[in-house]
Amino acid sequence: MNKGIIQLLALSLFCISVKAQDPWIIKADKIDPANYYGVTVANGMIGIVSSSEPFQVKNVVLAGAYDMYGRGRVSNFLNSFNLLNMYLLFNGDDWDASKVKNMKQELDMQHASFTTTFDYGDVASIKYTYYSLRQLPFCVLMDVSVTAKKTVNITAASVMQTPDALRDVQNYYNEVDGPTGRISLLTSTAKSPTGKLQLCASNAFIFNEADSLAPRLMHEMLDNNMHSMRFSKELAAGQTYSYSVVGSSITSAHTTDPLNEAERLTIFARLQGRDGLIKAHTKAWAELWKSDIQIDGEPQAQQDVHSMLYHLYSFSREGTAYAPSPMGLSGSGYNGHIFWDSDLWMFPALLVLHPEIAKSLIEYRYERLAAAKQNAFAHSFKGAMYPWESADNGTEETPVGSLSGPFEHHITACVALAAWNYYCVTQDKQWLQEKGWPIISACADFWASRVERNGPGQYDIKNVIAADEWAEGIDNDAFTNAAAKANLQCAALAAKVLNVKADPDWQLVAQNIPILKFPDGVTKEFASYKGGGIKQADVNLLAYPLKTITDPAQVKKDLEFYESRIPNEGTPAMTQAIFTLLYSRLGNGDKAYHFFKDAYEPNLNPPFRVIAETKGGTNPYFATGAGGIIQSLLMGFGGLDITPNGITQVKSTLPSNWKSITITGVGPEKKTYVVK
């Protein structure tokens, strides 16, 4: 390669870096449909995934809505009505995609909005922004502006489209008299594939004019699964005309009367007005961002970290009993099921920054405790055995072809430890007594019945799938055993806090569960492990989050052994986040930085730097990876530590190219921590 090409490439990389340095806004200045991975705007209930096509969104995902269809003979996430699609015609002519020029998009993470701009030939410039309204969990807003380049008649429509998987579609166009005039409602309802759920959505226009001066609306059936309401308007050259569409989407999983509730919610939002809706949404996100991670020294890392926080905040919300799937509300990846990803990887990050949101994730587990107890009973165990994959009712949802359902038992300990950590951070004894203790004690009972008692130090846990999921049918997996011990120990601690009698068998079992080692002192992943490649962190989780291994020399020995066992491709992003965290705590900031970058940069997809599960993967957004990386910043570089007495700070080391990291809004007291 000649010197000139090298210099040109270097200049290009510099320009890309400069463009990417805004801490809050990710811009896509060139839209390539062939290399486009949508980014999600969500409010913890409704997720809207962007599209490379003008006036389209890829799909709309609604938390808590599942039915049995599609993959695996198990429950799957349902795509909801696509209620934000639109069309815009000029002078009655058909839309001509070839006239779309200068199309740009941007995600504003600070305000949780997504904006598209483009020119339509020499006729008009268009800008639209949509929001998944944070203050209204079932509502969305689209804000549109059209600037005429010459005198033109526009026809604008809001389009309601039903996903193909839904059946028994019914479309309505209703008019309701409001306090200032008539409100027109574009409404659809349909059944889920088996008829289990009723899904409903409703839209209304918001005009800036007084209702008496607003454009006249017309209803139009476009297809059996698609209808619209439209208006026409004459614009003079240079004139800008703005309008909005507000909508709601809800199902019978959320309310007993979703059809009427969808229309009620749309009317409620419509009467708040466009400015009122955006103001309340912006205020809600400003409150969320009071808990932030600020990096001084690397603008691109700062933007990337904001993106991870943005997605974690977007995929969860206070006051629910929902937990995020590995892909959050970005689509139907992993069928929308809940795994240990929620409890071990996302929950701790949310717990430190927003305990009130984290509470929703553990509430999800509490409400499904009865199902976990039934699962334990069915497998001959006592207590509660949480399913590897969970959906709406807490029963096992793992497809039969995967053995993780009956054998990946460590998730039960992960749920219990999440409940204990919630108490540790909040110090809420009433919650611990009413909800935490039932979870923690039932999970401890499971482990006491799960072990095989083969003598002192040999309370074995046999025939499991490890956290390293390439290891199936193995005995005494390091993480499973250590997590079980931690569950039993925290149950005893919780009993002491509540002044209730702990089962003495818990401590006996905990003391006798083995953690195996090689002759050279390296912690052994499982009994028959010979040192081969592993899918993801297992042994290293004993140092964090379990704190089973605390000796720095042992932590380092295990790190150096297992970091060389992870293949460069095809493994999930969380592992490198744990390496980052542990190396930072060991004082090796530069090695921590290497793994920090390796945890996500090879996984990014254009144009919004969305994270896939694996290096080179194309299945964003991987919220599990984001949760792990945020933990590496909070508990690694930031040195935060969850203890029975609350959040404390331990010694940590920053990368040499970072000046400082500031973590704001930590814990219930909303403290600030700084590391320089």
From Swiss-Prot:
SUPFAM superfamilies: Galactose mutarotase-like, Six-hairpin glycosidases
Temperature impact on function: Optimum temperature is 30 degrees Celsius.
Residues spanning the signal sequence: 1-20
Keywords: Carbohydrate metabolism, Glycosidase, Hydrolase, Signal
Catalytic residue positions: E469, E613
Family to which the UniProt record says this protein belongs: Belongs to the glycosyl hydrolase 65 family.
Protein name: Kojibiose hydrolase
Source organism of the structure: Mucilaginibacter mallensis
